[in-house]
Amino acid sequence: MSVNDPIADMLTRIRNACMARHATVSIPSSKMKLAIAQILKREGFIQDFTVQEGKPYSTIVITLKYTPDRRPVITGLKRVSKPGLRIYTKRADIPRVRGGLGLSILSTPRGVMAGHEAWQQRVGGEVLCYVW
């Protein structure tokens, strides 16, 4: 089955795995998805991720993070810019998610980065998703 929006598919797989309390989730690999996984790990939303090389395609295996009482650290994921409606933002308008408790992920001319990193580097870009 072909996927029209691979990033939305990644976010949906993570959301479903969190709701089902799975330890890991497998996602078909791409450079953009790897960059998003690196940001999620750096910001503390996931425990770890590995890339498994495969014959038809490689996959990213994400180890999800839970609190001591087995509640998922990721409580919400939202795709913002979609293939049918791209959303771009200037540096001054980079959104704060949940009053600073969440994270916005942007695709900028300097690569994929978190919203606060883009603000520090004084660049805007396409708002890929929100995580909280």
Swiss-Prot record:
InterPro entries: Ribosomal_uS8 (IPR000630), Ribosomal_uS8_sf (IPR035987). SUPFAM superfamilies: Ribosomal protein S8 (SSF56047). GO terms for cellular component: ribonucleoprotein complex; ribosome. Transmembrane segments: none annotated. One of its GO terms (biological process) is translation. It holds the Pfam family Ribosomal_S8. PANTHER family: 40S RIBOSOMAL PROTEIN S15A. Belongs to the universal ribosomal protein uS8 family. One of the primary rRNA binding proteins, it binds directly to 16S rRNA central domain where it helps coordinate assembly of the platform of the 30S subunit. Part of the 30S ribosomal subunit. Contacts proteins S5 and S12. HAMAP family: Ribosomal_uS8_B. This is Small ribosomal subunit protein uS8.
